[in-house]
Design a protein with these regions (language model features):
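Non-catalytic, solvent-exposed segments at the cell envelope interface
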Residues: 1-381
Length: 381
């Protein structure tokens, strides 16, 4: 049973949220955004909130505790910058690479957000990181997590890798401090989407899968490597209802030969679209009025997320972001292009105007910047 007051306002269409506790509504948005990212819905029972809080993994993602910093409990106020990193771990002994790097910027009003991605192949200077015996150097951005995660004689530590990645992203963007961060296991996407009963999203163009057959099984590797053999799963342009494996597979695609002409930039756009689609799905009546489904989503989300709110819990942040909805999240595309040295591809670089975007984020001038640069708004978002 849902807890709360019954009844509706005259002349107003009843909300599916009527009678749902405020904490339950607001945990939806932040939980979903965190799950890229994302997805969790909390409705009806205090026990669900407790389960969610207890299920979410926690780690020292920014090195605060290791540095002796105290975590002060105070009100969460904007502006906020939240770093969201998706990983796709295959083996526990393999250092993780950051497959998706997103920043959610929330202005001081705390009622909307700007979501933008940094190319994982962005060529950057990665600072030295003595904890992992890394001396620093120039490499692709996603490698920062791998370098930082290394622990002598042990399996890699993703939380430590996140710390170096965060330092590198701060260096790239000029953002002095992240207010929260999360590591999302991409495999968890599948479980979350399936727990929600699938996700509805718009496919902007026909895309074929590099890795999956139409039935979801893996395609056969070519002898000697260099690609795959056999029929490919296809995602046709238009409205689609995707299962967990389909959603995860779709947002992984990045090759022009398979229908993604802008490569990793296209994949970033699809990931952002997927985040918003999951937010919408989480607010659907089918999810918010079904405690059994909610409980499944909770458990799937908690198992897929490591969170650090620098003294605040994920529920604290969800409450603080109570006014954000899917239609108030603006997805941003950062212009860039390839870096080649002696004809060989070495990664990506951002255009100079991206520095102006980062400055607008830092100085709370993002609205004025977007008015002057409407082309930064992601298409089909």
């Amino acid at each position: 049973m849902l807890v709360g007051k019954a009844g509706t306002d005259r002349g107003r269409k009843p909300s599916i949220w009527r009678g749902v506790p405020r904490w339950a509504r607001v945990c939806t948005i932040f939980g979903v955004v965190l799950m890229v990212l994302s997805g969790s819905v909390l409705v009806g029972y205090q026990a669900l909130m407790s389960r969610y809080e207890g299920a979410v993994g926690k780690a020292d993602l920014f090195g605060d505790r290791a540095a002796g910093a105290s975590e002060k409990k105070s009100d969460i106020k904007g502006p906020l910058n939240i770093l969201l990193v998706g990983i796709d771990p295959r083996k526990p002994e393999t250092p993780p690479l950051a497959d998706s790097i997103m920043i959610l910027h929330v202005p001081a009003g705390m009622d909307r957000g700007y979501l933008f991605s940094l190319p994982r192949d962005l060529r950057v200077d990665i600072p030295a990181f003595p904890k992992a015996n890394f001396r620093g150097g120039t490499d692709k951005l996603n490698a920062a997590m791998s370098y930082g995660s290394r622990v002598a004689g042990q399996n890699p530590d993703a939380a430590r890798g996140f710390e170096l990645l965060a330092k590198t992203v701060q260096q790239v963007t000029g953002i002095k401090r992240f207010d929260a961060g999360a590591i999302i296991n991409f495999t968890g996407f599948k479980n979350i989407v399936d727990a929600m009963g699938g996700v509805d999203m718009y496919i902007e163009r026909d895309v074929k899968s590099e890795h999956r057959k139409p039935d979801g099984t893996m395609r056969q590797l070519k002898p000697g490597g260099g690609g795959y053999l056999g029929p490919q799963a296809e995602y046709k342009k238009g409205d689609a209802h995707l299962s967990g494996w389909q959603a995860l597979d779709y947002v992984r695609q990045r090759y022009p030969k398979n229908g993604v002409p802008d490569a990793d930039y296209g994949r970033q756009r699809h990931q952002q679209q997927f985040v918003k689609a999951m937010v919408n799905q989480a607010f659907s009546a089918d999810v918010v009025t079904n405690p059994i489904k909610l409980d499944r989503v909770l458990r799937a989300a908690g198992q897929s997320l490591i969170f650090n709110g620098r003294g605040h819990s994920v529920v604290d942040f969800a409450l603080a972001l109570k006014d954000i909805r899917a239609n108030s999240i603006e997805t941003i595309k950062l212009p860039g292009g390839p870096v080649t040295i002696d004809g060989a591809y070495k990664g990506e670089k951002l255009q100079a105007v991206a520095e102006d975007f980062f400055a607008a984020i830092r100085t709370e001038q993002i609205d004025a910047f977007m008015l002057e640069h409407p082309d930064f708004k992601q298409e089909n978002s």
